[in-house]
């Protein structure tokens, strides 16, 4: 059976011996505490391409892509705008056995802003929002059919997010030419001040026009809008939400 037709889970464990470990890869996979899952959203992500395989990170540059085109076979390109950019989140969602190629990409005429909702683990998530002239540096996760179903479950399709085809995405590497999909928050964007959205400082952008607002300040705004603006610290609020989830 040709390698390209084999399921990722059936691939030999040592298949990735030809790949080079990503520099400082372990720092991107450090397990987060429950509080830090919300406090540190959307987490650190490499600026270039990487391969998550068997719980480890490998460099995925153009040379490796050209040598191993099979890693994209039967996969869907999904633009990651928030925590899904980060290896620690992909590993948490898909486990140590997962094999996921991730490649850098830019989204044009949009920024990544805080969404008007609170995640079940108390992070204020994010979504893409039109912003003429703005270019954001993101990445694309190449998911197989089972991984895509799992991603849909974690994103709350039809409740928290819609699954949509993305426009104006430009890949930074030569990868398969196919549609790019993504997730759009059904709640819309957080009104940070006078109807102005708030951008995420962790997302690199050129031509950004919206103010950059930290996770703590975004959560404070959500608390203000929902009548939960009290004396609790951000960490205390997170802990209470995670306990209650109501």
What label would you give each PLM region?
Residues 5-246:
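Glycine-aromatic micro-motifs
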């Amino acid at each position: 059976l040709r390698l390209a037709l084999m399921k990722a889970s059936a691939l030999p464990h040592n298949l990735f011996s030809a790949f080079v470990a990503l520099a400082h890869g372990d720092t991107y996979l450090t397990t987060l505490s429950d509080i830090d899952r919300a406090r540190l959203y959307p987490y650190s992500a490499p600026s270039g391409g990487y391969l998550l395989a068997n719980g480890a990170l490998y460099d995925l540059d153009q040379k490796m892509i050209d040598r191993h085109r099979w890693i994209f076979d039967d996969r869907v390109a999904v633009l990651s705008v928030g925590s899904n950019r980060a290896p620690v989140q992909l590993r948490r969602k898909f486990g140590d056995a997962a094999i996921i190629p991730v490649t850098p990409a830019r989204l044009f005429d949009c920024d990544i802003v805080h969404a008007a909702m609170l995640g079940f683990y108390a992070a204020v998530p994010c979504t893409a929002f039109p912003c003429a002239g703005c270019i954001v540096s993101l990445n694309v996760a190449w998911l197989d059919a089972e991984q895509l179903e799992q991603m849909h479950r974690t994103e709350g399709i039809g409740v928290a997010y819609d699954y949509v085809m993305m426009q104006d995405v430009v890949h930074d590497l030569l990868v398969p030419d196919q549609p790019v999909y993504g997730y759009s928050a059904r709640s819309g964007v957080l009104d940070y001040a006078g109807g102005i959205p708030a951008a995420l400082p962790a997302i690199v952008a050129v031509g950004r026009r919206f103010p950059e607002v930290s996770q703590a300040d975004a959560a404070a705004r959500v608390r203000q809008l929902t009548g939960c603006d009290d004396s609790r610290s951000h960490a205390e609020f997170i802990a209470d939400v995670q306990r209650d989830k109501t």
